[in-house]
Design a protein with these regions (language model features):
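Short, acidic, small-residue-rich periplasmic hinge/interaction motif at the N-terminus
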Residues: 29-36, 41-44, 72-76, 86, ...
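Extracytoplasmic beta-strand/coil segments of soluble accessory domains associated
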Residues: 142-181, 185
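Flexible loop and strand-edge segments within Gram-negative outer membrane beta-barrel domains
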Residues: 288-386, 402-420
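Structural signature of Gram-negative outer-membrane beta-barrels, strongest in the C-terminal barrel
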Residues: 5, 385, 434-440, 453-585, ...
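N-terminal periplasmic accessory domains that precede
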Residues: 92-95, 141-144, 159-161, 174-177, ...
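Membrane-embedded beta-barrel scaffold of Gram-negative outer-membrane proteins
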Residues: 396-406, 513, 521, 554-611, ...
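Gram-negative outer-membrane beta-barrel transporters
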Residues: 240, 584-586, 608-730
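Short acidic/polar hinge/loop motifs at secondary-structure boundaries
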Residues: 59-61, 181-208
Length: 809
């Protein structure tokens, strides 16, 4: 028996030794040839493959023989090398990959939660590079988003392809993310743009169309994802400071104050790799008096002092301080593991003005009760851990604590705490023998606690809770090295206080590469948006106009379908992409902020019960075409970059005559207003011609061109918006029927401004040397007086002097 065991062990060891002797190992590190930064590239040979870890290290074991090794990474030139391996050999091969400097490539992550060439994604996307933000001296990201094709910012609320209108800050159909984590407030679903770290943006990715499968409820019309930059071995230091002045109103009668309003600020960034530790530190300081006049007291008095960056005295003024930190550790003990924490702290004071005083002498002042002063404190902490396995697996755990405190001066404050957690498992099956196949699965848990004087419609003490649970799965497969297929499903469940609702949503898409740089795509995606705490329970007032709660409001659903083509081109030294898409988005239970007689006990004290409320208004549809063009041209020491787009939409109500709400007033009540007894799309619109939805801009033109000639740089931007045909008819009705209570001149303004808006910006800069640059940046150089949303004036001409210092690889 002992002899048999001995012989068996000897045979096993012999076989194992023989097997080991027949194989060989190739190992090494993959880096960027220019920056020496580690790259998570894929190495393939024969039917085997291996992915590098976060430090760029890889290892692949092969039988003896001669193989062609291929190394690929998006944005870098593919490397091929023939290697002959001998049995038992261990070969070191360090790989330095060259960036594709001779090709125009755009790499995105948002479309499928993994890196893809922008031409191969199945949805419509726009990408904005940070250079545009820096050159235009954009201090808050919403200013830069206005330059993106197909995107409009209406009073700080994002619209993508007319998928949303204006909700007075309650609810959003566009999900806003930073590094895939949502940043919309937990109570109102509203973005705080000044919180986002402008100083460390690597690029902005905009998905157009329903994206609820990957990004949840608020992605009904699209996603805006801000991606931050990782540090390199060489430190990066950036400093940008500016001082500017607004032009006075063109109409002297509207100017009731003396000196010009001013704006100043500073951004700073430091980032570096320290061994296995990545560190990013950023800060931003800004003081902006805005373009409106000084705040008046009850007697009409206002501040006449000099500019004080610590004090907010204008109706559009803001001061803000922000610090941010990104810390990532690449584990030395566990290969492939990295973990860390990101954090942002922001505090600022601002005035928000909803309605101007009147359309002549009061354009730059506020209607009584419509200006709110807010001291906002916003904090986020984002612990995370990511593990890259040997067989193409990626496990990621991302969490966030977000605390938002809006301390308002009119007893309308609110506070919310959000806890967010997402576990995601992603598998690249190439190392397991299935080429070009990636699966992504995840679980999401969100809990929100909110309290505030604004949200007493649910509980008298203003305390409300909300929760969200979701699971999702996405499959991405490439066939024949030309056809990309993507499909996904998500089940999402929401609860607010005691109400719970869940629903599955689906998406599918295909992208076919016809030629070297021609890509056809088709996609279908469903959306599901549960109302926010604000939409259900807000109780407040806008001067004399009340806002009412609607605890019975239902979730809205949608689908988005589109066909598109992206064409890459190279004409001499000019390279870029042209993209055209036709699309349709259909909504059910469409939520709109609607004016009506909502108080069951109307009196003169509550303005006959008139006010606004979020209600389900039936069906809606948006059809349109979207064209965009982006690219660059380079020769010698000169270059030109361009981004342009045109979007046409036809946003309509599909149920214009449906009575979607009735006034809760007894029919015998003498104060029942018959015009508001039954609410329909047509009856609540200022101009229901062709059933065009409210607060939509049907034509958008966006152009930005920047050129560099040696040390000099110039640039110009154009934004053109068509006339906003339809708004809430109540504004005009109130002005007609109750001029002593509400008379801002909206009827006259809209009659005189029917041609849309055309705004031009310009910039001119000089590089003193490789580190120092000075520039003059001007926005609205024609000093046009215009309002995208009626009753809210847009910025006057602003001229800034900018200084930039940059030290980076």
């Amino acid at each position: 028996m002992k002899l048999a065991k001995f012989l068996s062990l000897t045979i096993l060891l012999s076989v194992g030794s023989y097997s080991f002797a027949q194989t060989a190992e190739v190992y090494g590190t993959i880096t960027d040839a220019v920056t020496h930064e580690a790259l998570i590239a894929m190495v393939r040979a024969g039917d085997k493959g291996a992915s590098a870890d976060l430090e760029g290290k890889y290892s692949i074991t092969m039988p003896e023989g001669t193989y062609t090794f291929e190394v690929k990474y998006i944005g870098y030139a593919t490397i091929q090398k023939s290697i002959t391996l001998k049995a038992g050999e261990s070969l070191l091969w360090d790989i330095a990959m060259e960036p594709m400097s001779n090709d125009f490539r755009v790499v995105v992550i948002s479309a499928g939660k993994y890196e893809q060439d922008a031409g191969e994604v199945t949805v419509s996307m726009e990408v904005i590079k940070p250079k545009l933000f820096e050159d235009k001296n954009i201090a808050s990201v919403e200013e830069g988003l206005q330059q993106a094709p197909g995107v409009a910012i209406v009073d700080d609320e994002p619209q993508i392809r007319s998928g949303s209108g204006y909700s007075f800050g309650a609810g959003s159909r566009v999900q806003v993310l930073i590094d895939d984590l949502p940043v919309l407030s937990g109570d109102a679903g509203k973005p705080s743009w000044g919180f986002l770290p402008m100083e460390n943006i690597s690029q902005v990715e905009i998905i157009k169309g329903a994206s609820s499968v990957l990004y949840g409820s608020s992605a009904l019309s699209g996603v805006i994802n801000f991606r931050t930059a990782y540090p390199t071995l060489t430190p990066t230091v950036k400093l940008q400071a500016w001082q500017g002045m607004y032009s006075n109103p063109a109409d002297k009668a509207a100017r009731y104050w003396g000196r010009n309003n001013l704006k100043s600020g500073l951004n700073f960034l430091y980032s570096k790799q320290y061994g296995n530790v990545d560190l990013v530190l950023g800060t931003s300081l800004q003081a902006d008096e805005g373009h409106l006049g000084p705040v008046k007291d009850s007697l009409g008095n206002f501040d006449t002092g000099a500019f004080n960056p610590m004090n907010v005295t204008r109706y559009d003024g803001e001061n803000r301080a922000r610090v941010s930190m990104n810390l990532r550790v690449r584990s030395k003990k566990i290969k492939g593991l990295n973990y860390g924490v990101n954090g942002i702290f922001s505090q600022g004071t601002s005035y928000a003005t909803l309605i101007w005083e009147n359309d002549s002498t009061g354009l730059y002042s506020a209607y009584e009760g419509s200006a709110t002063k807010t001291i906002q404190t916003l904090t986020t902490l984002d612990p995370f851990a990511i593990y890259y396995g040997k067989k193409g697996a990626k496990h990621s755990l991302r969490t966030r604590w977000q605390s938002l405190d809006n301390n308002n001066d009119n007893n309308q404050g609110n506070f919310s705490d959000v806890l967010y957690g997402e576990y995601q498992y992603q598998q690249d099956w190439a190392s397991l023998g299935v080429e070009h196949f990636i699966t992504t699965a995840g679980v999401v848990v969100v809990d929100t606690k909110a309290r505030g004087e604004l949200f007493t419609g649910g509980n008298p003490d203003g305390r409300n809770t909300a929760g969200n649970r979701a699971i999702f799965l996405q499959l991405d497969k490439k066939f024949f090295n030309r056809l990309n297929i993507s499909a996904g499903v998500r089940y999402e469940e929401f609860n607010i206080n005691s109400e719970t609702q869940g629903k599955p949503v689906f998406r599918a898409g295909a992208n076919y590469k016809v030629g070297k740089a021609t890509f056809f795509r088709a996609s279908y995606g469903e959306g599901f948006r549960f109302p926010s705490i604000a939409e259900k329970f807000i109780v407040t007032s806008l001067g004399a106009v009340k806002v009412y709660a609607n605890p019975d409001i239902k979730a809205e659903t949608s689908y988005n379908a589109e066909l598109g083509i992206k064409q890459g081109f190279k004409i001499g030294s000019v390279m870029g992409f042209a993209d055209v898409a036709v699309f349709q988005q259909e909504f059910k239970n469409f939520i709109e902020f609607t004016f009506g007689q909502w108080n069951p006990n109307p009196t003169f004290d509550n303005m006959l019960g008139l006010g606004f409320k979020s209600v389900n208004t039936g069906g809606a549809r948006v059809r349109g075409v979207d064209f965009s063009l982006m690219g660059e041209a380079k020769w010698n020491k000169s270059s030109v970059q361009f981004l342009a787009g045109y979007t046409y939409t036809q946003p309509i109500s599909t149920t214009p005559d449906q009575v979607y709400a009735t006034a809760p007033v007894n029919a015998s009540n003498p104060f029942l207003l018959r015009d508001f007894a039954n609410a329909t799309f047509a009856s609540t619109s200022s101009d229901p011609t062709n059933n065009i939805l409210k607060y939509r801009l049907q034509h958008l033109i966006r152009v930005d061109v920047g050129a560099t000639f040696g040390s000099w740089s110039i640039g110009a931007s154009v934004r053109a918006n068509s006339h906003m045909q339809n708004i809430d008819g109540a504004f005009e009705t109130l002005e007609k029927e109750f001029p002593s209570i509400f008379n801002p001149g909206i009827i006259r303004w809209r009659a005189e401004h029917k041609k849309g808006d055309f705004v031009i910006d310009a910039r001119f800069g000089y590089n003193i040397n490789a580190q120092h640059k000075v520039a003059i940046v001007a926005s609205n150089i024609l000093n046009r007086v215009y309002a995208i949303r009626p009753l809210a004036l847009e910025d006057s001409r602003l001229v800034l002097v900018q200084y930039s210092f940059s030290l980076h690889p």
